[in-house]
Structure formats: C-alpha cells, structure tokens
Swiss-Prot record:
Residue ranges of MORN repeats: 219-239, 243-257, 337-352
Observed effect of gene inactivation: Severe defects during embryogenesis, producing abnormal embryos and thereby leading to a lethality of young seedlings.
Cellular compartments annotated: Plastid, Chloroplast inner membrane
PANTHER family: PROTEIN TIC 100, RADIAL SPOKE HEAD 1 HOMOLOG
Protein name per the record: Protein TIC 100
Tissue specificity note: Preferentially expressed in ovules, and moderately expressed in leaves and siliques.
Length: 871
C-alpha cells in the first residue's frame, strides 16, 4: 500500500515538475528561434538550416535535471574562478603524494625486459669494461679509439673544444634492436621469464643458409632475420681466416675458435729474391717437395705470372697499415684463439696460440691484459674447451646440400654427418645415417652406439603426434623425397667372379641416365682432359661406340655458352692495305711459282749444255789422240825405212837406234825450242799442282805411263813396239789400236833389209843421254816422284801434237833407247870407261828434279855392264 501511495504521489508531482521544464523548453525554443531568425537575417541567404536538421538536433538534445534548491547560485561561479580553484587542489600536497604512490606502483614497458637485480652488485669497473654514451653528433652506433676513423676523432675533438670531457677509453656499446622483436600486446610475454621462453621458441625457426659474398668470403650456418645468429662457420677470402663458433646478430659473440694463417714469403723460382734468401740461409719450402710437386708448383707460378700481366695486389698481412696501427707487421705463421668473444673481438678468458707459443689470460676487446683478473689456467682451459665444442657444432652446418658453396665447388657427398672420436679425429660419413656409404670396420662399434642415440633423437620427430619443426637436414630430405632425381646411375647385374664364384663383380662400367631427356651419358678416357662425358647414341647389339662421332658434353661455362671473342677495330688505312695485300697475294703467288718453274727449266737446260760440252771435249780429245798416233806411226815408219837403208841387223838395230838419234846435231834454234819446251812443261806441272785431286791423278797417270812398259828382266829381246801397246791402250778410247799397231810393226820387220856396219866413231863422238833415279830434298809435304828428261847436247827434242802426246812419245823413245843400247853395247872395259868418262850414266847435277823410273835405271845399268863396246 505504501508503494502504491508513493507511485501515485510521484505521478501527481510529475506534472508539476514537468511544467517548469516545459516552460523553460518553450523559452529555450523561443530563444533559439529568435536567435536563428536574427542570425538568418544577419547572414541573409548565405546560411540556411533545414527542418529535418532541426528535428534531428531536437531529438539528440540531452535534458539535464537540476534539483531545486533554496541556496541562491554563487555569483562568482565563472570559468576563471573554477580554473584557479582546480589548480590549487592539484598543487596540493595530498595530490602530489597520491601521484608519487601511483608512480612507484607503475611498471614501465622497458622494465618488463630487465633481468633480476644482481645481488652481488657488479659494476662496469668490475667487468673491466667502461660504458658510456656517445656524443649526439656520433652517427655510428659506437666507437673504439683503437679502431676509430677520422670522422670519429672529429666528433671527439669538437666535444673537447666545447668544454666537455668525453671519455677517451670508453667503448660505446652499439645499439641493438630488441631481440626478439616483441610487439607491445604480446600475450605470452609479461616478464623476463617470458622473454627467455620466447627466445627458446624462436631458436627453432632459425634458417640454415650457405652464402658466398662478392669479396670471396663465405658463411655457412644459421641466420635469423638475415643476420648471422646461432652457430656458423665463416671463411675469409683465400681461406686464410676461418671462424667456427657462436654468432649474435652478425657479431662473433659467445664461444668460438678462429684460425689465421699468415703465409711466409716464398720467392719465385730463379728470381733475385730466391738468391738473396739462400745467401741468408733461409729455408725455402720448395726444397723439401718431391720432384713432381716441385715441377707442378713451378708451372703454377709460371702460369700465375703470365696471367696477371704485370698486375699485383698487396695482401693484407703485407699492408703498411699494420705499421701505422701497431708499429710493425704481424709475425708470419699460424694464429689460433679458442675462448670467449664479444662484439667480434676476443673478450674474456681464452687460450691464444702463436706459432706453437701458448698464451692465456683475460682479453679485453682483442688485447691481452697483463693481469689475469680471474682467468687462471683452469678457467682459460674450460672456456677453450667450450669454444672447441661450439666450433664442432658449427661445423655440422657446412656443406649445405642446396647451398651456394656446394654449387660453386661442384659435386660433393650429400649431407654430411661427422663423427668425432678420441683425440679430435674426424671421419665423415656421407648421407643420412650412413645410407650411402658403409662405416669403416674399425669404427663400426662406436658408430653403432652413436647411431642408436641419434635414431632416438630422430624418432622423436618421426613419431610426434603434431607436425614439429625438424632439423634442417630432415626438412631438406622430406622436401625432395618426391622429386625425381636428375641423374640416375645405371648398372648391370653383377656376375660371379671366375676366380671366386662366391663374389659378384661388375664386368662393365656404369652409365648415367639423364632423366629429363631420357638420354644416356657415357664417358671415355682422354689424354688431354682425363675423362670426357658424351651423349651415347643408340647402339645395336655388339656395336661399340666410336668416340670420333659422338657429341661430347661441354667442359665448362666458356664452352657451353661460347667464349666471347673480342674483335678489335682496325684502322681504316690498315684495313685498306690488308685488303690490297689479300687481293694481290694470288698474283704474287702465281708469279713466284712461274719464277720457280723458269729457274728449274734453266737449270735443266744448263745441265744439258754442260753434258753436250763434255761430249764435244771427249770427241776432240779422241780426234787429237788419233792424229798423234798417226804422226807417231809415220815417224816410226820413217825410222824403220832409214834403218833398212843403213843395213842394220836386228841385234845392231836394238843398240844403235837410240845412238843414231843421239848423233843428230843440235842446232841453236833447236836448243832454244828445247828450253822453251822445258819451261812449258814446268808451267804445266805447276798448273797441275794447283788443280783438284782429279787433275793431279790424271797428270800422274800421264807422267808415270812409261813405267808400265813391259818387264825389265835381262835376256828379253822382244820388239820394243810390243810394249808400247800398253801405253797407247791407257791413253786412247779404242782398244782396237793395239792390234793395228802390232800388225803394222810386224809387216815392217819382215820387209827390212840387212843393216850395215855402223862406225864406232858415231858413238864416241856423240853426246850421251843419262837417265837416273834422284831423290832431291823437298821441303814441301806435297812432294811427289815425277819423271823428267835431261836435255844433252847430242839429243834433240821434237814437238808432236799436244803436251799429252809429247810426254807419251818421250817415254816410249827413252824405253826404246835403253833397250837398244843394252843389246848392242860390248862388255869391254874400254867402252865402260868411255861411258863412265862421258857421263852417260852419271846422276845429273844441274837438274835434280829430272828422274826416270826405277825399272829403267836398273835395266839400263845391267845391260851396259854386260854388253861389249862396238868396234
């Protein structure tokens, strides 16, 4: 009942309460209308409000209820007073105290990622690190005095000039973006523990990459957001620097091992530097190589020098910047550090080895401190071992199957699983769990144990109910398991070995099948390139491949794409000259050929003419010889006729014929002719000596011809003409002359008359001719024994024909005279004394070079000794 009464009373009061509001609303409407009218009148047609807009505004109007009160409104309730009152309240102590309490309770966003406070209260000085903020003008994330450049020092000098005191030694920590990149509204991260868990999850999404950079360096390992993160291997250009270990946003940080090799200078073979080093007693590596290795090294050096074409580059270890920074160049040899790293510097505890000299201690951004500062031998050995483990884990990521390094270096066993044994021995088993190659027997036990552990680890991924990220090697294997391989190795079924049937052997070499094209690739041994691959054509049964008709695969990119040939533009004048030369060349070649043919024909014609001349000369010589023979025959015929007229017998004839010749009176004219003839003979002899061997032999044959006239035995009484046939036969071309001479001489002998007595006075009064053997002393080594004639008063020399015929006739006459004198001389003492006194057989003193043959001298002396003088 009470509630009903209350509602009724409220309903009764509502009209009374709504009336003033209605009046006010009307008043407000009237005011608004009046205002709108006034505004519309003032603005004219420029401003117009539609009725629909007025209705909308009326619907959206909020009605405020003001409780009636007996207190009159405050006359000072204006905006300025209200603002002044609010400021007095906000500046009060109570409000400030409340704000401080709220601020203390508030957790800033940056504080969410702070690790718990250090109860030991470590400071920068305790860490041997001085941290500071860089100047505002410093555009780089940080700087270090040891590695600062000119821009960094300019900023520091400006700070000093402005009166500030920037730290000279501090190392400014480079700014790093938050790791990981966590959004503000991440619901999984509320504190430091959430950050660690997020890092663990992100670690599973690291990517395995294999890069080769433009400068020749390479990196193989894990990356996060295109930055080296996790574990990896970095190899600098030429492989002189190698780092294996942990990375943090492209910086070597954590534990790792670095190997640096600074090679010693090796001189070029045969250079002045080599001679200088040998003089100093330096050791040259080439001296300890095998002959084959030394030969290959020399060829490599020769090719390198030829290809560089005079260009060279100073290596980093020979750069003068080392002297500028450190005062001297680094020591040649091997450097190795295993330990802690920070900001790509040796920072912390570690072991440093320089050419087998071991150093250990605390390193401060690459510099070894004098004091240990807690890095004792044991601590350094511990961190060195951790670095070796990190390096071994980093090496697990080398040789990525589809990486750039594998593509550059060529074929390589697919993904590698290294096994590490005692004493740091390593054996690489290609393939996933040795599926391609078997493990050596002496490692089977150890590998079996390792494989069991590895299979348990891999099975955790195989049998997982959900699809979890797997190791990179399994991801790669599963992605390519359905892909058809590009090349397949084809082998025939093995056959039993004839020597050992229990073993199966392959009798033919395998071939390669190119699956995209279906063609077979075979190979053949090549002397130049070793092994050449070629596309094998279809073969019939029993047919063999002909290497000369097959299509070989290209040896490299140059052969595949074609080596670009640089065409040099020639000068127009040079090209014009070459064109003329090319057009004229056939004409010149034809002219040269015609000249050679003419020259050859001329030489042949010349040879024919020489042969004709020789034949003509032979004919002339033959005619002269025949004429000389005819003259000699006439002479002999006249002598025989004279003998028959004188009535000499055959016995007297043999002795008196030469004496009769000697009885002839020698006139002055004949003596002059004789002297001239002798001089002519001497000149001919001198000319013959100056000629070649053929002329000397001919002259010797002519001079020594008479020595072959028969035998010189006593008691022989043959006709002197019988022996002359030998001499004529040697001088003429026709042997028929001998028979003609013999027949004519026999006919003359048969018709001769009886010879008359010859007066002995003829012999006594006549001058005798002497013939002897004489060997004068000769100073020349070319001296020879020659035959000559001694000219006496009772002997006249006549010239018949040529000199050749004269020498033959002289030899014949002398032989005949000797035979005749030997047969007719008496063996009394008076004749011998007379002959001795007359000097017939004495050795000629005036002309020592005139000699006769030894046979003639002996024969003549014996005959005169036995023949009596003619009375």
């Amino acid at each position: 009942m009470a509630n009903e009464e209350l509602t009724e009373s409220q309903q009764q009061e509502d009209p009374s309460q709504q009336l003033p509001n209605a009046d006010e609303e009307k008043g407000s409407d009237s005011d608004s209308n009046s205002d709108s009218d006034a505004s519309s009148q003032s603005s004219g047609d420029d401003f117009y409000i539609s009725e629909s807009e007025n209705e909308a505004e009326g619907d959206n109007t909020i009605f405020n209820y003001v409780r009636p009160s007996d207190i009159p409104p405050d006359p000072n309730a204006n905006p300025e007073t209200n603002i002044r009152r609010f400021n007095r309240v906000l500046d009060g102590k109570r409000v400030k105290r409340m704000q401080e309490e709220e601020e203390d309770k508030y957790t800033f966003y940056e504080d969410l990622f702070d690790f718990p406070r250090d109860p030991e209260r470590w400071k920068e000085q305790d860490l041997r690190e001085i941290w500071a903020d860089g100047p505002l003008e410093m555009t780089k994330p940080g700087w270090d005095p040891a590695w600062a450049d000119e821009d960094d020092w300019d900023v520091v000098n400006d700070e000093i000039q402005e009166g500030r005191d920037p730290g000279i030694q501090p190392f400014y920590v480079p700014y790093r973006k938050p790791y990981p990149a966590i959004p503000d509204n991440h619901y999984d991260i509320e504190n430091a523990k959430g950050v660690v868990e997020e890092l663990d999850r992100i670690e599973e999404f690291l990517q395995w990459v294999s890069y080769i950079f433009p400068d020749g360096s390479s990196y193989e390992g894990t990356v996060w957001d295109d930055l080296a993160q996790g574990k990896g291997v970095y190899i600098a250009e030429n492989g002189l620097v190698r780092y294996e270990g942990e990375w943090l946003q492209n910086d070597m940080e954590g534990h790792g091992v670095i190997d640096v090799d600074i090679p010693d200078i090796e001189p070029i073979p045969g250079s002045k530097l080599e001679a200088k080093m040998r003089a100093e007693g330096r050791i040259i590596k080439r001296d300890y190589m095998t002959p084959e290795d030394r030969k290959w090294l020399e060829m490599d050096v020769e090719d390198s020098v030829a290809l560089t074409d005079g260009n060279f580059q100073v290596p980093f270890y020979e750069n003068e910047e080392w002297v500028t920074q450190f005062g001297e160049k680094p020591e040649k040899g091997r450097y190795r550090y295993a330990g802690q790293w920070k900001h790509s510097r040796m920072h912390g505890c570690g072991v440093y080895e320089v050419n087998e000299r071991i150093l250990y201690g605390r390193f401060y951004f690459g510099e070894l401190l004098e004091e240990e500062h807690g890095c004792t031998v044991d601590i350094c050995a511990l961190h060195s071992g951790l670095a070796e483990v990190a390096a071994a884990k980093a090496r697990m990521f080398v040789n990525k199957p589809d990486g750039m390094i594998r593509e550059e270096r060529g074929p390589y066993g697919d993904p590698q699983h290294p096994y590490f044994y005692e004493e740091d021995d390593v054996w690489m088993a290609p393939g996933f769990i040795n599926q391609f190659y078997e493990v050596p027997e002496y490692w089977e036990t150890y590998v079996g144990e390792v494989d069991q552990e590895r299979e348990m680890w891999l099975n955790s991924f195989y049998k997982a109910p959900l699809r979890l990220p797997m190791p990179a090697e399994l991801e790669h294997w599963w992605e390519n398991v359905e892909v058809t391989p590009e090349f397949v190795l084809l082998n025939k079924e093995p056959e039993p070995d004839p020597n050992d049937p229990s073993k199966l052997v392959q009798k033919e070499d395998p071939v390669i099948l190119h699956t995209p094209t279906g063609r077979i690739i075979n190979y053949v041994e090549d002397e130049k390139h070793g092994i050449r691959l070629f596309w094998q054509p279809p073969l019939e049964e029993g047919e063999e491949v002909d290497p000369s008709k097959v299509e070989f695969l290209p040896l490299g990119f140059d052969e595949f794409y074609g080596k670009e040939v640089v065409v040099k533009k020639e000068h127009p004048i040079k090209s014009f000259v070459l064109g003329i030369e090319k057009s004229v060349k056939p004409m010149l070649d034809g002219l040269e050929k015609w000249t050679e043919e003419k020259k050859k024909a001329y030489e042949e014609r010349k040879e024919m003419i020489q042969q004709e001349l020789e034949l003509v000369e032979a004919e002339i010589c033959l005619e002269e010889a025949i004429e000389d023979m005819d003259e000699e025959l006439k002479k002999k015929e006249q002598e025989e006729e004279k003998k028959t007229e004188m009535g000499l017998t055959e016995e007297d004839e043999d002795v008196l014929v030469p004496v009769y010749k000697e009885e002839k009176v020698v006139t002055a004219k004949e003596k002059i002719q004789e002297n001239k003839q002798e001089e002519k003979y001497k000149d001919d002899d001198d000319e013959d000596d100056d000629d070649g061997d053929d002329d000397d032999d001919d002259d010797d044959d002519d001079d020594l011809g008479p020595s072959s006239f028969g035998s010189a035995d006593k008691g022989r009484r043959n006709s002197p003409f019988s022996s002359s046939s030998l001499s004529f036969a040697s001088c003429t071309l026709f042997p028929a002359v001998q028979s003609r001479l013999e027949s004519s001489f026999l006919a003359w002998k048969q018709h001769r008359a009886e010879p008359s007595k010859v007066n002995t006075g003829i012999i006594k009064g006549a001058d005798t001719a002497s013939a002897s053997i004489h060997f004068p002393p000769l100073s020349s080594n070319n001296a020879r024994l020659k035959m000559g004639k001694v000219a006496n008063r009772g002997c006249v020399q006549r010239s018949y024909g040529s000199s050749r015929s004269q020498s033959q006739l002289m030899s014949l006459s002398r032989l005949l005279s000797c035979n005749a004198s030997s047969s007719s001389s008496p063996p009394d003492s008076s004749s011998s004394e007379y002959l001795k006194d007359s000097g017939l057989w004495e050795t000629p003193v005036g002309d020592m070079s005139v000699v006769l043959s030894l046979q003639i001298q002996t024969k003549c002396s014996d005959l005169f000794a036995e023949t009596p003088a003619v009375s």
